[in-house]
Amino acid sequence: MNIEQRVTELHQLLHQYNYEYHVQDNPSVPDSEYDKLLHELIDIEREHPELKTDDSPTVRVGGTPVSAFEKVDHDTPMLSLGNAFSEEDLLAFDKRVKDEVGEVEYMVELKIDGLAVSLKYVDGVFVQGLTRGDGTTGENITQNLKTIHAIPLTLSVPLTFEVRGEAYMPRKSFLALNAYREKVGEPLAANPRNAAAGSLRQLDSKLTAKRKLDIFLYSVNDLRELNAQSQSEALDKLDEIGFKTNHERKLCRNMEEVFEYIKYWTEKRNDLAYDIDGIVIKVNDLSKQDELGFTAKSPKWAIAYKFPAEEVITTLNDIELSIGRTGVVTPTAILEPVKVAGTTVGRASLHNEDLIREKDIRIGDSVVIRKAGEIIPEVVRVVLDRRPEGTKPYNMPEICPSCGHELVRIEGEVALRCINPKCDAKLVEGVIHFVSRTAMNIDGLGERIVEVLYNEDIINDVADLYTLERERLLTLERMGEKKVDKLLAAIEASKTNSLERLLFGLGIRHLGAKASMVLAREFGTMDNLKNATVETLTQIDDIGEKMAQSLVTYLQNEDIINLLEKLEQYGVNMRYTGVTKDDIELHPVFGEKTIVLTGKLTIMSRSEATKALTNLGAKVTNSVTKKTDIVIAGSDAGSKREKADSLGIPVWTEQMMVDALRN
């Protein structure tokens, strides 16, 4: 046997033993035998690097570190699921489904508490692995995913498709990681989910390999790649070709059986070797999934039931007040630090005066804390039988804790507000919002630096940011030359932002990012917008009377007029530079059309096509309905194309779309 033949044999043996151990949980050889063969292959590849391949079992131990993760568009968006928190929510979901498609069965699966990933295979070889990211674009973590032994590097059949699943850290691996961190004096990981996410984002895959991650696969981008007619059949076929799926799933005939499954796992979840945070319920029949379709954010045929949040008792030591950019006074509970759902909680929002009175929350009380949606800490209730003697009902102040101005409560609102336009806290919060990523996107201006600039009287409003001098900034603590130069470059770059970013950055009450875009596109310039009336504004889709009145009042304020003049004087762009209504009129093919993309696109990515069509005024949706104007079908388009044909909706090829875009 020559060296090439031995390498091939080692590949086959190691892949087989790996599958038996990590997927089937039924090893046929001891660990020592596997390790012996693996080290033999490592030695051969070290001496003959030309024999090392991308699917070699040795990639399981990690490879050369990378400097950063590449951003890659998903071929099909990785949508999140809608959430249910009660039986009532699930019954409402069941009714919506049955109203549209009649009786259904549900495939019910454990919701693994990990990190969603997609795995791409070409001719049966694993070639790319991405994080969910924002659902449209993920990070390429292929090398790190290759260290997860349950992910097959090659399949038994030469399929070209994308499979999705949840990478996670087993509890045993999590305990081992924290034991090691404690030993070497490093901070402990908060919970297995955070540890798994951090492990998969290590730039050195050798570190990822040491974390002993695992994975369950739960879906294929196009389930017909497996010739499956249902979710249950698709999962069985994933098992057959070498993937690891979760076998605690169950096919339920009705919601009563779903409730039984939820009740069982609510009680038994702690017996598992991994964390789960809920149950996923999916319509089993794929044809009915297609019929139900999607919303912009999630499939209509699936929902995630979230387990009730863990509740713990701690002491409320104080109530701290903060002032937001619109003057709203928000009370925050300062708690005796306590572990809740894996992380330490020391603060929780009390929202407003009414909530404090309704729950009779007092300083010194023992309170029940939980995380809403297992994310945001909240005070659930007071433990009255533990209330210390001498506590007094908490009263919100009558004057602003920042500027001393009288606080007011506007009719119809629950919040107390400081209406002093010169309030220090409001001005600082306004600047923080102005520089944020979704507004003017001035990188390097964090909350601490903004507060220093304001307290040192270097800035008094957002316009002063454009007068910052290098020499003055260098005198500030922790502001070195590189940091200052980077900050000044970011400020200069922000001058060219399109009008919608400036509008949103100004923090106008009731005006969000979407409305800012609508107004910028509609009016084109700040001058045009200044001349708008409430009547003209309310004629625009998505602009209500409250928003219109707030905008007109804001732009007529003398201080704001002066502020905008200063910003323009300092070179800040006051025009909309994106695609305008006039541009849309130049593209009558796609302007104001509802378009559905389906199948595999090969010339453009799905996100590129969506962006191009949207910029020309099209509305891109996921479901084919009577309101759809055009269906653009790539290869393997499936049921959406069939539905378009049945409704008489024009079906275009990808090339036809590209030709129209070019023209």
Swiss-Prot record:
Q: Please name the NCBIfam families in this protein's record.
A: dnlj, PRK07956.1
Kindly state which reaction or reactions the protein catalyses.
NAD(+) + (deoxyribonucleotide)n-3'-hydroxyl + 5'-phospho-(deoxyribonucleotide)m = (deoxyribonucleotide)n+m + AMP + beta-nicotinamide D-nucleotide
Q: Which domain of life is it from?
A: Bacteria
List ligand-binding residues for Zn(2+).
C400, C403, C418, C423
Q: Is NAD given among the entry's keywords?
A: yes
Give the first-level EC class, as a single word: ligase
Name the job this protein performs.
Answer: DNA ligase that catalyzes the formation of phosphodiester linkages between 5'-phosphoryl and 3'-hydroxyl groups in double-stranded DNA using NAD as a coenzyme and as the energy source for the reaction. It is essential for DNA replication and repair of damaged DNA.
Q: Which Pfam families does the entry link to? A: BRCT, DNA_ligase_aden, DNA_ligase_OB, DNA_ligase_ZBD, HHH_2, HHH_5
What sections of the protein cross the membrane?
A: none
Per the Swiss-Prot or TrEMBL record, the active site comprises K111 (n6-amp-lysine intermediate)
Native organism is Macrococcus caseolyticus (strain JCSC5402)
Q: Which family does it belong to?
A: Belongs to the NAD-dependent DNA ligase family. LigA subfamily.
**Name used for this protein in its record:** DNA ligase
